[in-house]
Amino acid sequence: LWRGVLTTIEVSWRPTVDPERFRPHPTSPPHRPAHTPQPGGVRGADPGWAADGGRGVGDHAQGQQAATVRAEFFWGAAGEGSVTGQANAQDKADREPAARPRDPRSRLAAGPSRGGRGAQPEPPRGSRRETRKPSRSTPLPELLTGPPAPNLPGPIAVEPGRRPSPPPSTRPTYRRRRPTAATPSRKKKARRGPKASKAGREGELGGGSPVAHRGTSLGTGVRDPAPRGGRGRARTPGPVHSAAGGPGSRRRSPGAARDPGPEPGEERGGGGKPPLGSPRATDGNRDPGAGVPARPGRRMGGSSGGRGGTPGRGPERAAPGARPTAPDGAPGRWDGPADGPAPGLGRGGWGVGREAGGSGRSVRTAARPEPCRGLRRGAAGTPGFIGFQMPRLGGRSGNFPPPRPMPGTGLALPRCGRPVEKYRRMRTAHI
């Protein structure tokens, strides 16, 4: 219902230009009335100017959320010549046939013998019968042809055309327990873990002295069991534990040779992580390094909104970088973003809904895509992020290392790989 109401409002509302509030763009042609058909645009789009993006069509709206498509036009201030997504409703109306009248033979109208409830008298509005469901405890007398059958397994007499009910089950009613997972034998269990070499006898897999297996995958030597996150140090160099970054090492990060992981006694989860903001931090939760557009996280940005309009296809289609004409008739130029969006470029719409603000796709991808609207520059996850405002923790707490202040800012950086979402609430106004 709400969607219907909103769409109706949206479709019926046309932006009008109040000459007092919106001065036309200095180089814009006089405002044309809304009904003059224009070349260009998409599928009978609302009139823009030929060089503009036409109407964005919200077929990229996610799920139920209708996208309000704002094709920002080349000439226009926000109110002038811009179209605020009448797209969806109209499109939907074009694509879907009108609802068909209900077939009188449907089950609702059918009599009780065909599984329906027969034609019911319309209850007076507001009566309690509207809300109450018919009780299911009493069997419908039409279903049984004779007196109820004696309490024996076997089909009940049923009116022809209906399937007889299955015989009542004679099994006891307790639930079968699911079999538990097979427990590994004790000997096998003992073979894992730090003292694996003592398990089993000589000649068994993993048994005997580790030196006997040197050079094989079992010859990893006596190990220091590693605290969580470290890799236990093998005192016998085997093929698995060659020098960090060497051919046999299991680490795949490009910086492995420069940045050996933590010593076994040190409890820093994972390998050595590059500091936040270094160009090597490729993790999506951190500063992705210069020039990499932020990947919008899950909470930031619902649907990505509609596509921006496709460039107009009229005879006056502007070449990129040139305007058809300036008001005085001289050919004009597009001097950059200060002149409004680039010619022929509709901007993506905004998603509507709880998590509005997807990164709208534009028709022609700009050189540096702007991150989605929910993120200001410098917020977590965008290039230019300095760090989170952290509480000053004494010692350790949870899995925080003690924060190290960053010179020049009053900020401390979290040094552990918890996802950014955890800190999102701590973000303060100056970031």
From Swiss-Prot:
Residues 17-66, 81-415 are annotated as: Disordered. Residues 235-244, 317-342 have a biased composition (Low complexity). Signal peptide: none annotated. Residues 173-195 have a biased composition (Basic residues). Residues 91-106 have a biased composition (Basic and acidic residues). It comes from the Viruses. This is Uncharacterized protein UL61. It comes from Human cytomegalovirus (strain AD169). The gene is UL61.
